Amino acid sequence: MFGEFSSTMQNFLDLIMIDLSENHFSRSVPAWIGDKLSNLVILSLRSNNFNGHIPHKICDLQFLQNLDLAHNNISGVIPKCFNNLSAMATTIKINNFVLVKYVDAGLVFLNALLVLKGREDEYWSSLGLVTSMDISANSLTGEIPKEIGSLVGLLSLNFSGNLLTGNIPDNIGNMELMESLDDLSMNQLNGEIPPSFSNLNFLNHFNVSYNNLTGQIPTSTQLQSFENLSYVGNHLCRPPLTKNCTSKGIPIDVANNGSSREGSKVNWLYVSIVLGFVMGFWGVVAPLFFIRSWRLAYYRKLDHVGRKSYVSWATMDM
């Protein structure tokens, strides 16, 4: 399918699932989805040609548990109002197992195809067990809003392949149910990996590669269990990487590069002095060597000065 998103769909008020992924829809994601389809639990529009911004009306979908807008051309910032997605922000424990409640009538069971933990899995289970948000591979800019940390019911989060900047919000570490902080990779994030990430005890997938992150990788059973590839393309140190840190938490190779640069400045100072001497010396000698008339004049002058000096010295002795 291609073209615009059909507006006739807004008449299906009882819809709880829209999956129009891998089509050729274009234009903006319709704002009326949040206005009219208030019972939506799953919204998957991945792998289309949607552009424009994420409509703030999406934040009105209080039952939404699976939002997938990945692989489109969506720009703008991540809406701060995402913390209003109450089904992603609420947890209930039943027999020590965490579920997310989204309707008073109970939990709806659906056969849902979701992209989770870096692979496609088909779940015959309550939707409350697979709450996820994937807005990867777009052109989103700005910072990750700290309000994302309120979505404590999320099990999977993927913001990779955008143009996001700034620090990673510390309160993402409060999302202790997170199993798959699938990807913050391939952005322009800076600062440190928040120490609170050591609280994410259920993580089985994690990737912050190819950003501008610096400092130490927080110590936890989970964070040290991932491969180096989860951290490459940054300026990080400590296990699982082989780079050690200085006492200030700076990777040693970065610190050494700084020292090398300072040493290079000193070396260049000496080099410039030597070059200055050589250039000055040859600036005087080269004309005498190559121009015969200058050479003869120089020797006559030198002979004249020598004779004059000798006469002065001899006169002083008398």
Task: Name each region found by the language model.
Residues 1-318:
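Membrane-proximal ectodomain caps of single-pass cell-surface receptors
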